[in-house]
């Protein structure tokens, strides 16, 4: 057992196993899993609605926890994870500020429908300084923008698995004890806590389904920014 697993940080395990990545089963109707890492998801909805919760929802929840008790929360990239986290944050009584691609009026309207108090383009500044911001879009150029948007002592959380290179920026954006953090995977505790609050928060999961043999079409739609909510593949 590695040091991270002993410390309850199995999300940083030196020898991790991931279904669909290091282990087969990501698109299977049945798979074998270690029961210690399986979550009870009864009563959370139909299979299509639950699917985004098991990826975007879980990493979204961990990034929200890492963002801390931010009253004014910015979300950069209003996709699968963003639209779930926005609802949870609004349910918790936070003020959500949603940032989308420039000109994506549909996504901005969608964010307002889900409880955002403000929605605009990612290159716009929010009307008020943020306590924290979470970046879901894999665009490194958003990091300086998010740092500029948060108050002194605020946090910027990079929640993606990968991100394009972060451009250089003046130290003044990070100064005054702003924090820049990343998120990697999740722990069992994250999953247990998340699925406890899902029924309470009354989440509305927006999905668009694609047959498995149209997976490349789903990726193309995602890249083009033509999807509201989450894409779900059905075998």
Task: Tell where the protein language model's regions lie, with residue ranges.
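Structural detector of well-ordered beta-strand residues that form the stable sheet scaffold
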Residues: 39, 74, 97, 155-157, ...
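Mid-domain Rossmann-like dinucleotide-binding core that forms the NAD(H)/NADP(H) cofactor-binding site
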Residues: 43-123
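C-terminal hydrophobic helical "lid"/dimerization subdomain
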Residues: 144, 188-235
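Short strand-turn motif at the edge of the Rossmann-like AdoMet-binding core
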Residues: 159-163, 183-186, 210
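Glycine-rich cofactor phosphate-binding loops and adjacent beta1-alpha1 units
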Residues: 97, 105-179
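Short beta-strand/turn micro-motifs composed of small residues
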Residues: 77, 100, 137, 160, ...
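NAD(P)H dinucleotide-binding glycine-rich loop of Rossmann-like/cofactor-binding domains
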Residues: 1-76
């Amino acid at each position: 057992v590695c040091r991270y697993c002993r410390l309850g940080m199995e999300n940083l395990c030196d020898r991790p196993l991931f279904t669909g990545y290091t282990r087969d089963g990501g698109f299977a109707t049945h798979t074998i899993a270690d029961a210690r890492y399986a979550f009870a998801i009864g009563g959370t909805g139909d299979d299509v609605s639950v699917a985004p919760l098991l990826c975007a929802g879980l990493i979204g929840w961990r990034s929200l926890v890492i963002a801390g008790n931010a009253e004014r929360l910015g979300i950069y990239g209003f996709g699968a994870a963003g639209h779930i986290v926005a609802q949870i944050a609004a349910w918790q009584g936070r003020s959500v500020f949603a940032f989308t691609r420039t000109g994506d009026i549909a996504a901005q309207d969608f964010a307002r429908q889900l409880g955002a108090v403000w929605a605009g383009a990612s290159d716009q500044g929010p009307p008020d300084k943020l306590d924290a911001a979470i970046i879901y879009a894999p665009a490194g150029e958003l990091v300086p923008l998010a740092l500029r948007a948060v108050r002194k002592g605020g946090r910027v959380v990079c929640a993606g698995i990968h991100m394009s290179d972060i451009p250089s920026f003046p130290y003044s954006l990070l100064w005054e004890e702003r924090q820049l953090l990343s998120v990697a995977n999740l722990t069992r505790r994250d999953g247990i806590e998340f699925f406890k609050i899902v029924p309470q928060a009354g989440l509305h999961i927006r999905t668009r389904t694609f047959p498995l043999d149209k997976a490349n079409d789903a990726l193309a739609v995602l890249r083009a920014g033509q999807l509201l909510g989450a894409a779900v593949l059905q075998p």
